[in-house]
C-alpha cells in the first residue's frame, strides 16, 4: 500500500476542463447549442462543430507522467532507451519495474505502439511509441510515420477498452520535427478517430509544456471548433493537406490504380493502350520503373533472362540501396560501434571489423543495419580487403538470422564478394562453426574457402599486425583469460 499522500502530485483527468468549456480566443464563453445549417453561400468545414467530440478533448499544461488516466503515452527511440523529459519523468515515477518490463519488449519500430503496465504511476498502462526523425526531403515519410504513431496508440487504446488516454507531444526536439506540422497531424488524427470511434474513448488529453501550449491552443479550433462562428473562421486557416478520412497524409501521385482484371495478360490490353493520350507518359511518380520486376524474377527462375540482364537488374537494385544508405540518418546504428574500418593486414589490404556483441538484433531496425553496412563498405570494397568478425561473448540476441545474411549477400554488389580475400571468425564456438559450415556450404558456397576460424588473437596477429587493428577491451580480456598473455607465434595464416 502506498504511504499517505504519496500520490498527491497526480492529476485526475476527469476533473480537468474539456475543450468545449474553454473560452475562445476573444475571451468570451463559447456559445452552446446544437449545430445549425450553414447559411447559403457559406463554406462547409471538413471539421464541423461537434460539441460531443469537444467534450472528450482536454488541453492540459503539465507533465503527462502525472496524469491519472487509463493510459498515457511515452515517446522514445527504437530501442526504447531515449533520454528526453517525457521518458525520464515516466521512468522516474513508475519505478524500477518499468525498466525490467521494457527489456522484454525487444524494441519498437518507428510508428508502432507497444503496451506495458503503469506500475507506480496513477495511469494503469503506458503506451510506448517512436516518432520519426524529420528531414525536409523525407517530409512525406515523416508525416506518414507520425500519423501512424497517433493512430496506432488510439487503435491500441480502443482494442484494450481504455476509457482515457493522455498524449505527450510525440515528436521530441532532438528529432527536429517542426511543432506546427506535428500538431496539425496529431489533432486531425485524433479528430478523425473520435468521429468514427468516439464511443470507445471518454477522454483524450493533450499534455503539453509551456512552449507547446501556444501552438496547440492556436490550432485546436481548426479541428475542434467550439461554435459555428469559430468553425467558419477556421476554414480559411486549415492547411491544404488535411489527409484522408482517417487523417492520414495523402500523396496523389503515389496512388496506384489497380487493374480490374489483374490476371489478364498484358497483351490483351496492348491495342487499347495505344489509343490513349500519350501526353501523360512520364508525368507520374513511377515513370522511371524499368519493366515488371516480378516478371523479371519469374523469367530468371525459368532461365529465360540473360546473364547480362540479371546483372543489370542486380546493379540497379544495389544502387537504390546505396542511394538510401548515403541519405538516410543512420547515426543510431553507427553509435553501436558494431562495424568500423581499422588498419591494413600484412598484405596491405584494408581491414574491416565487425563486433558481434555490439549488435542487439532484437532491438534495432535490421534494414537500417543493412543500409549502414552498405554505407561503410561500398568504398572499401572497391579494392582487396579482409573482414574480421569478433564472435567473443555474443549471446542469442546478437546472432544474425541466416535469412538476413542471405538477403544481404544477394543485395550487395559483386565487388564485395570478388575483393573479399579473407573472413576471420575470431573466438568461434562449436555451434557457430557448425552454423558457418552449413551457411557457407549450402547457402553462399562462394564464401566457404575464405572463412578462417581463429581460436585466439595470437593467430589473428600473424595475419594482421596488432597495431593495425582496433580490438574492443572485452575481447582482449577474454582472450587473455582463455589463451594467456599475448605473444608472437607462427601460423598458417602467414601465407594469406
Swiss-Prot record:
Residues 44-224 form the Macro domain. InterPro entries: CRAL-TRIO_dom, CRAL-TRIO_dom_sf, Macro_dom, Macro_dom-like, Macro_GDAP2. It holds the Pfam family Macro. Residues 329-483 form the CRAL-TRIO domain. SUPFAM superfamilies: CRAL/TRIO domain (SSF52087), Macro domain-like (SSF52949). Residues 25-48 are annotated as: Disordered. Belongs to the GDAP2 family. This is Ganglioside-induced differentiation-associated protein 2.
Amino acid at each position: 500500500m502506498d504511504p499517505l499522500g504519496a500520490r498527491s502530485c497526480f492529476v485526475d483527468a476527469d476533473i480537468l476542463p474539456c475543450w468545449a468549456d474553454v473560452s475562445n480566443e476573444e475571451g468570451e464563453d463559447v456559445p452552446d447549442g446544437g449545430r445549425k445549417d450553414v447559411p447559403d453561400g457559406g463554406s462547409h468545414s471538413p471539421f464541423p462543430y461537434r460539441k460531443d467530440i469537444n467534450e472528450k478533448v482536454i488541453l492540459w499544461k503539465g507533465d503527462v507522467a502525472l496524469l491519472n488516466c487509463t493510459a498515457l503515452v511515452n515517446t522514445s527511440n527504437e530501442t526504447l532507451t531515449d533520454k528526453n523529459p517525457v521518458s525520464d519523468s515516466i521512468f522516474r515515477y513508475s519505478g524500477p519495474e518499468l525498466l525490467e518490463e521494457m527489456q522484454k519488449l525487444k524494441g519498437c519500430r518507428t510508428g508502432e505502439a507497444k503496451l506495458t503496465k503503469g506500475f507506480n504511476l496513477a495511469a494503469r498502462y503506458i503506451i510506448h511509441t517512436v516518432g520519426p526523425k524529420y528531414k525536409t526531403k523525407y517530409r512525406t515519410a515523416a508525416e506518414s510515420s507520425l500519423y501512424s504513431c497517433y493512430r496506432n496508440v488510439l487503435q491500441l487504446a480502443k482494442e484494450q477498452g481504455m476509457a482515457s488516454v493522455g498524449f505527450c507531444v510525440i515528436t521530441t526536439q532532438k528529432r527536429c520535427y517542426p511543432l506546427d506540422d506535428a500538431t496539425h497531424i496529431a489533432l486531425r488524427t485524433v479528430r478523425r478517430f473520435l468521429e468514427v470511434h468516439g464511443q470507445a474513448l471518454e477522454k483524450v488529453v493533450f499534455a503539453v509544456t509551456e512552449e507547446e501550449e501556444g501552438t496547440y491552443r492556436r490550432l485546436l479550433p481548426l479541428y475542434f471548433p467550439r461554435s459555428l462562428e469559430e468553425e467558419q473562421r477556421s476554414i480559411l486557416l486549415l492547411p491544404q493537406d488535411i489527409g484522408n478520412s482517417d487523417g492520414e497524409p495523402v500523396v496523389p501521385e503515389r496512388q496506384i490504380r489497380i487493374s480490374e482484371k489483374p490476371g489478364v495478360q498484358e497483351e490483351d490490353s496492348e491495342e487499347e493502350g495505344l489509343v490513349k493520350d500519350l501526353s501523360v507518359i512520364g508525368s507520374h511518380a513511377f515513370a522511371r520503373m524499368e519493366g515488371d520486376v516480378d516478371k523479371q524474377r519469374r523469367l530468371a527462375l525459368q532461365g529465360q533472362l540473360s546473364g547480362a540482364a540479371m546483372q543489370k537488374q542486380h546493379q540497379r537494385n544495389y544502387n537504390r540501396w546505396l542511394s538510401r544508405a548515403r541519405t538516410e540518418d543512420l547515426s543510431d546504428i553507427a553509435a553501436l560501434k558494431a562495424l568500423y574500418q581499422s588498419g591494413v593486414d600484412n598484405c596491405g589490404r584494408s581491414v574491416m571489423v565487425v563486433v558481434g556483441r555490439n549488435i542487439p538484433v532484437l532491438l534495432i531496425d535490421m534494414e537500417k543495419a543493412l543500409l549502414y553496412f552498405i554505407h561503410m563498405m561500398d568504398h572499401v570494397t572497391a579494392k582487396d580487403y579482409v573482414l574480421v568478425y569478433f564472435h567473443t561473448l555474443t549471446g542469442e540476441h546478437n546472432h544474425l538470422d541466416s535469412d538476413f545474411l542471405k538477403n544481404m549477400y544477394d543485395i550487395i554488389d559483386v565487388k564485395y564478394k570478388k575483393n573479399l580475400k579473407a573472413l576471420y571468425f575470431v573466438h568461434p564456438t562449436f555451434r557457430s562453426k557448425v552454423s558457418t559450415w552449413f551457411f557457407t556450404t549450402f547457402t553462399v558456397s562462394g564464401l566457404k574457402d575464405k572463412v578462417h576460424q581463429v581460436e585466439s588473437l595470437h593467430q589473428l596477429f600473424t595475419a594482421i599486425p596488432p597495431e593495425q587493428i582496433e580490438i574492443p577491451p572485452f575481447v582482449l580480456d577474454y582472450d587473455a583469460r582463455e589463451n594467456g598473455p599475448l605473444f608472437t607465434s607462427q601460423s598458417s595464416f602467414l601465407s594469406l
